[in-house]
Amino acid sequence: MKHAVLRAAALALVLFAGQAGATNWLKVAEKAAQGLEDRSSTVQHSGTIEYAFSPHEGAEKLVLKVIGSARSEIRMMTYSLTSAPVVEALIAARRRGVDVAIVSDYKNNVAEDKSGKARAVLSALVNAGCRVRTISIYPIHHDKVIVADRETVETGSFNYSDAAANKNSENVMVVWRNTELAKGYLEHWNSRFSRGDDYQTRY
């Protein structure tokens, strides 16, 4: 919230620039506003770190372990979501009472999904009771993240796809039971989910 307010204040400087030099003021204000978002965060180490690779080196198995560990909540960010084992695990989590919410890239999963597989997956998740949104405000929504129970974070290069599990060189890292790290990732997830649109199932 603080950064949003400061960004608005920086852009408001343009209103006082007058006609002369307004373009330069706009560039300065936009640069200042952009700088407010260019930040990193640090958290204290806690919990256990587990990692795996692919193809066929345990990456997908570790993702499934995280989903299977969830007792109350899963928050997920995806670019690709076509892995049958991952989708089945998410649906199983929902059926055992876990609140599952997902934000996924619109272009990859809807607009350019020529096979219809990605749309079928999103529909299956919605029909199972998961909350699914797609986001299109970025050229690519490339996050690959799962936050389980507000304490465990899974991330890495691993797309939730068959290719990532069986063909591509990928990595997965899980930080178990680190609530501060999970809090930061949840803030990022919320910022994307809030800008997404509910996926309307066609099945």
Predicted regions and their residues:
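Bacterial N-terminal signal peptides that target proteins for export
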Residues: M1-A9
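N-terminal low-complexity, Pro/Thr/Ser-rich intrinsically disordered segments
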Residues: W25-H56
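Short, flexible loop segments at the rims of nucleotide/cofactor-binding pockets, characterized by
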Residues: E50-P55, T78-Y79, C130-V132
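N-terminal signal peptide c-region/cleavage motif recognized by signal peptidases
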Residues: A17-Q19
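Mature N-terminal segment immediately following signal peptide/propeptide cleavage
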Residues: T48-S72
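Solvent-exposed loop/turn segments at secondary-structure junctions
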Residues: S80-A84, Y106-V110, Y138-H141, T152-V153, ...
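Signature of lipid phosphatidyltransferase scaffolds
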Residues: W25-V28, S40, A148, T152-Y203
